[in-house]
Amino acid sequence: MVVAVLIGGAEAPGRSSSIRGAEGCRMGFPRVMPPVPPTLRASAALLVLCAVARLGGAPDTPAVLVSVSWEKTLIVSRTTPTLQVVVNPMLRPGSPIHDGALAALKAIHARYVRYVPWFPYPRLVVPELEPPSSAGTSWDFSLIDPMTTDFLEATRGEPTVMNFSTIPAWMFRTERPVAYPADPNGLAWDYVQGTELRDPSCREVGDYFARIVEWYTAGGFTDENGRRHSSGLHYEIPIWEVLNEVDFEHATTPRQYTERYDAIVAAVHRVSPKTQFMGLGLGAPSDDADLVEYFLDPSHHRPGAPIDYISYHFYATPAAAESPDTWQFTFFDQADRFLATVRYIEAIRKRLSPATRTDTNEIGSILPGDPGSLTGPPPSIPDRYWNAAGASFAYVFANLARQGIDIVGESQLVGYPSQFPTVTLVDWRNGKPNARYWVLKLLVDHFHPGDRLVETKAEGGDVFAQGFATPSGRSLLLVNRRNTPETVTLPAPGAVLETVDGATGEDAPRSETLGSDTVRLAPFAVATASWR
């Protein structure tokens, strides 16, 4: 229980923008108190915002009561849960976790997995690192193909989103050539430089990406000098995403991005006519309404340029001094602000380009110091973090499903020290999936487009609940948003309960058949209850 402190006969606020742990204060002291001088009242208010934290599981704590109105449909789901795979050295053949990570990707059977060869490792993501000349070209896929074909084989039979997100540095006007490490595993955080393309028509950048697509779909391509390069590869690319986080990279303006998007789309469409296209990939969508508005306006595009999808990202980011006791507020408060941003972007999309679909393809959390100061094994990541991060993702997924978002992608398959270790779904030390992965697998296994989201209430605590009517029966998603246990009363006796919590660790969800209507959710637990 949380105590709201009364100062001088007035109830102190139960929430503070600077002290997050006070959210949810409900139980107050009696209001009959002696007067307190104003100076003491102000001092006391600074000292005691919340005197007692919630005591989950205390005998006098009432159970959270979940009720579901199965006949009241909120929305028919359009939402697919999935993940992204970001290229880094841990995915290379020979890596100690290569096989484990690939097995985890195959086992999840997710649709619309996003594949992103991203700029920090230029030799692993840019197949033409030097500009062409009359003497020849630098096209070389030898380091890139092994990881890319691993991905395409692991996801064979499912639609994917491909995004070779990095424009070669030499295509931009810079004071001097941009250097990159000789070591393929070497980091180059400064590889992205310049703001203006050396070819303002954007034909050069469009042709570059078209050749990459031809390499993987048409068996090869002809380079700038007329020489044929053969790959023997004939994969399909259902969706091509055009660049990534352009609001952070190259100081890209809305007009610049739209011109580059149109040029790339036109070039790729010529060589892969069935491919659909995804735009924006915004890193900070709440700050980029002007970019969204400009890009979604068809009048700013070439005639006939398709805008099949837009995409954008969200990461919860607690402050350095925070702990699990404050993450429980920070993660979900920031998630709610992101959900408000989504509603705003949806209003723009529906007004300007209603046929365009949405992929929120990087959802996660990042702890302070990641990646910059976490260059070695980071003992500062407590096990409970993975549960908190998983709970946050499940909460965001369900609320995005309520808004009709098409794809919700968790970030990312593999991170490790120096490359966002707190974002990983697979333990970089042993290749085993962590709690974030198992939460995603619960969602992939249980919730699909076509399910009905129905009116669901959870009263008396901090558990989030959402009922889904599915072709196989009824399913209930439960998320404990707090760092304390919660007792929950469900309308589901005899249901099969699958749970990810601190006790499951890096193992698969625990499964049990309920013998009563009451369940106990550990801190940051995520569970599904399913029955016919």
Residue ranges and their predicted role:
Residues 54-242, 248-249, 253-285, 301-306, ...:
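Non-catalytic accessory regions flanking glycosidase/transglycosidase catalytic cores in CAZymes
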Residues 8-13, 18, 23, 28, ...:
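Intrinsic, low-complexity polybasic segments
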